Amino acid sequence: MTNWQGKNVTVAGLGVSGIPAARVLHGLGAVVTVVNDGDDERSRAQAADLEALGITVRLGDGATLPEGTELIVTTPGWQPDKPLFAAAAEAGVPVWGDVELAWRLRGPGSAPWLAVTGTNGKTTTVQMLASILTAAGLRTAAVGNIGVSLLDAVLGEETYDVLAVELSSYQLHWAPSLRAHSATVLNIAPDHLDWHGSMEAYTADKGRIYEGNRVACVYNVADKATEDLVRAADVEEGCRAVGFTLGTPGPSQLGVVEGILVDRAFVEDRQKNAQELAEVADVHPPAPHNIANALAAAALARAFGVPASAVRDGLRAFRPDAHRIAHVADVDGVTYIDDSKATNTHAAEASLAAYGSIVWIAGGLAKGASFDELVAKSAQRLRGVVLIGADRALIREALARHAPEVPVVDLDRTDTGAMPAAVQEARRLAVAGDTVLLAPACASMDMFANYNKRGDAFAEAVRGLGA
């Protein structure tokens, strides 16, 4: 669709991507109708702003396909089994996401995309990648789920040499035309299964990121599912499979040798040679899963032709966002770490693996997850556990099965005041040399607006210990 004038487009959902999409489409000359399930005060205020522009908004009815619709542009949160999409399929109306819209609106000579997805580590990897690209002197931005919106990056006045793009499984589901320069799936673990319907569907949507890649499909050697997705992808001729590993890399891989990040993929005679990129100490923090993120970012940057020195300089300059394995304080010889971003079992497992003797604060909304494997793998590291949140019983039961000797404090409350109580209980269980780790393995919305608020509450409670 290149001529938007007079096209009838329905935007499914208000919010951070729906509203910008509606504005952009209206500006292109489309006849835009926004449909939204909710009809609350916030939705009505958003609707009023759009209606002032001449955009039609229909609140409280997101199920009915507006008459004459030629295209639906959906926000990522709308599940594929929504009645609206069934009606669209029956009527032969295509459905795009905001990523698909941005991809289709790119102009001639637009910046190529280096794309990142995975169950965990997406944001950190994209930010590392942007830091490396910047160190190489390239005009770039971290876009997608973070930083600049994709629509702004594609349509804005600022020009870029290359974009570092974070993509969720939701976004990839609705982006059939996306063709990245190079891409990576960092890891695959059960998450968002309520949205996708099955692990198979979730994995398949992640794998869409490799379709049509031109230069490199970067996979995790330790996660065979990611390599399987590369093998299944239909890519351009000459596109290479490149692995990253925390071990010694083979040919066409990046890895670690004696504390050095090395490249055996983007070098001459990769059967015999390796290029030093950076030291493990250049990665902040140097936890194993974060080193893996750095290797993936380095692989994408190297695929774009970035020199080794820029990888080193970019990693040295990078600092992670708050609530990602963030050091809060040391109190009475105990280290307090905020990893509130660990909202699923895979992320929590990586966080727990980075420390020795741990008092673990966990719980929240489980999103259908099982905790048996997580607890079984982490049991030997646990000094004690403090449970909070709506689904804490699921973790308690897994602890009873796989770590019955570990002391567990079950806080039977879901108000925000539970966090100071949890920190006090963790302090009581911990001894000098231990780490008190907030790695909830669950979503936060039962108690907090988001994981940031949860992490803030933890940090505030910890700082109160030293007062």
From Swiss-Prot:
Signal peptide per UniProt: none
Chain sites annotated for binding ATP: G118, T119, N120, G121, K122, T123, T124
Pathway(s) per entry: Cell wall biogenesis; peptidoglycan biosynthesis
Main location: cytoplasm
Family assignment from sequence similarity: Belongs to the MurCDEF family.
EC number: 6.3.2.9
Reactions catalysed, as given in the entry: UDP-N-acetyl-alpha-D-muramoyl-L-alanine + D-glutamate + ATP = UDP-N-acetyl-alpha-D-muramoyl-L-alanyl-D-glutamate + ADP + phosphate + H(+)
Family matches, as HAMAP family: MurD
Role, per record: Cell wall formation. Catalyzes the addition of glutamate to the nucleotide precursor UDP-N-acetylmuramoyl-L-alanine (UMA).
Record organism: Streptomyces avermitilis (strain ATCC 31267 / DSM 46492 / JCM 5070 / NBRC 14893 / NCIMB 12804 / NRRL 8165 / MA-4680)
Localization annotation: Cytoplasm
Keywords: ATP-binding, Cell cycle, Cell division, Cell shape, Cell wall biogenesis/degradation, Cytoplasm, Ligase, Nucleotide-binding, Peptidoglycan synthesis
One cellular-component annotation, GO: cytoplasm
One Pfam family named in its UniProt record: Mur_ligase_M
Biological process terms in GO annotation: cell division; cell wall organization; peptidoglycan biosynthetic process; regulation of cell shape
UniProt-recorded name of the protein: UDP-N-acetylmuramoylalanine--D-glutamate ligase
